[in-house]
Design a protein with these regions (language model features):
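Intrinsically disordered, low-complexity Ser/Thr/Pro-rich tracts
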Residues: 1-265
């Protein structure tokens, strides 16, 4: 994604800040390693970037909204056939929550919703989160958009821009890949959501943590990374490769992407 999008994201965060006053058996102990970083200066999304599993088409980042909040999304629900939409205030309180059962189309289901909310202040920072889970109830994807909530006035909606693309792309690692040898090599490109550490993690379908790395990126530009995830399994094990970041406003994830694979000894 282009540098200009990064700069726009910075200006959005500055605007929002100025407008509000925030009232199995695991493997060896995971170790933090620095990423191999090669920032890109390309003016368009890098080859290989693809539409996100959760596309929040409306509202865009930095939108100023009154109640009801109009939400338009396209999301791949997965085996659960459910899409979870939550609106949070700047202190983490839940302002609105909707769960929709959808057909589960492989390319995603379209939803148009209205989320009612009430705030006591004239304005405050809000976070819209959309998530999906697998059939066992484990989070598999989550996307967030920061907006400004208004108690009255007129909504001003910004476009989604490059936010409709997935923040991560893995190189030479197809979905449902078979991995052997006790170590998964992961290379790709990632566009950070914020300045929080980025977690790359292997988790079995039973919910067991198998391996974890922590990556630190110096800025919010798209950047290349490379790491390895050692693991130990006694036989073929279905798992997911996760990459996620925590929200620096809410106490919880801001972004989650996962990909299915099978681990072999």
């Amino acid at each position: 994604m282009p540098t200009v999008i990064y700069l726009t994201a910075q200006s959005i965060n500055q605007t929002l800040s100025a407008a509000t006053t925030p009232t199995g058996e695991p493997t060896e102990t995971p170790t933090s390693i620095p990423p191999t970083i090669a920032p890109t200066d390309t003016p368009t999304p890098a080859p290989g970037f693809f539409p996100a599993a959760i596309q929040i088409n409306k509202p865009g980042p930095g939108s100023r909204v009154i109640s009801p909040l109009e939400v338009q999304i396209v999301a791949v629900a997965g085996d659960s056939n459910k899409i979870d939409v939550g609106l949070f205030g700047e202190d983490g309180r839940l302002l609105g929550h909707i769960i929709k059962v959808v057909p589960g189309h492989p390319t995603g289901d379209f939803l148009s919703l209205k989320v009612q909310f009430e705030i006591r202040a004239a304005a405050e920072l809000g976070v819209l989160q959309v998530s999906t889970r697998d059939k066992l109830g484990h989070l598999q994807s989550l996307s967030s958009v920061r907006i400004l909530l208004l108690s009255n006035g007129v909504s001003q909606i910004t476009p989604a821009g490059n936010a409709i693309y997935e923040r991560v792309t893995f190189q030479n690692l197809p979905v449902k890949a078979d991995v052997t040898g006790g170590e998964l090599s992961v290379q790709g490109q990632y566009t950070p959501y914020n300045n929080q550490p980025v977690i790359v993690e292997l988790i079995s379908d039973s919910g067991q943590g198998l391996s974890l790395r922590v990556l630190d990126f110096p800025n919010l530009d798209p950047q290349s990374f490379s790491t390895t995830l050692p693991y130990k399994v006694s036989g073929p094990t279905r798992a997911r490769l996760f990459i996620h970041q925590e929200d620096d406003v809410l106490k919880g994830p801001a972004y989650i992407y996962s990909q299915e694979l099978t681990l072999n000894p």
